[in-house]
Amino acid sequence: LNPYAFHFEEIKKITKGKLQKIVLASILQSDFVYNYEYEPVADFPVYDSLLERYGKEIPNPEVLVATRSKIDIKKHQRAITATGQPAPDFLLADSSGKTYSLKDFAGKTVYIDAWASWCGPCIAELPDYKKLVDKFKDRQAVIFVSVSIDDTKTAWIEKGLNKHHPPGLQLWAGKGGWRSTFAKNYYISGVPQYMLVDGEGKIIDFNAPRPSSGEKIGNAIAEALKKKELGPAYFKM
């Protein structure tokens, strides 16, 4: 019995009537949407089956319709951000106003860090981020790009750059923060978020390991560089 199916059946045993419907609806609206965002795509048929089975027990059809809509969005997001898909291009400026496009980094492995000056977890990652950048300082084939989603350029510079001195190339997503084109195209729903893109502009990992993962992210970058050096034909042998 699938853990979620077991969970649902247990809830049905210990709750009744209106309370049961409320609890089941709550799980569908929260846990299920989360699964479609973070769990393996291969597991989607299982969750589809559970949604079909237990969704019928939700008395309010609007809840089920809204949940299905959210899930459809997540499925689409996962499809276009899957490994091998082209990463969305961007045109963003650094603190001096010089603009950069993802295409400018063609041929290089790109580690993208979406962050904000007000984000505690983002700041907590900086010591390890600096170590990661330093580890690959002699490798010209990798570049570290941080994109701030601070609402204003002033906040980004004064509270972010000047205060914390983050490493790598520092860019600003532009006005709007969460509503900026970058945030929308990269589906930034929380920060920090890290992404790894190969030299052809294709996604390696849209939810790459954090700098604090240590060897995990170090090995991921090293593997990407190795593939670039040996060429794709080598890995098809």
Regions flagged by a language model, labelled:
Residues 109-110, 192:
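Alpha/beta-hydrolase fold active-site loops
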Residues 106-107, 113-131:
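Conserved redox-active cysteine motifs that mediate thiol-disulfide chemistry
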Residues 1-100:
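Oxidative protein folding and maturation machinery
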Residues 113, 144-148, 172:
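Short beta-strand segments
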Residues 6, 88-93, 157-199:
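Short, internal strand/loop/helix patches
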Residues 106-108, 139, 165, 188:
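Active-site acidic short loop of glycosyltransferases
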Residues 124-163, 177-183:
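Structural microenvironment flanking redox-active thiols in thiol-disulfide oxidoreductases
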Residues 196-237:
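Thiol-/selenol-based redox modules, centered on thioredoxin-like
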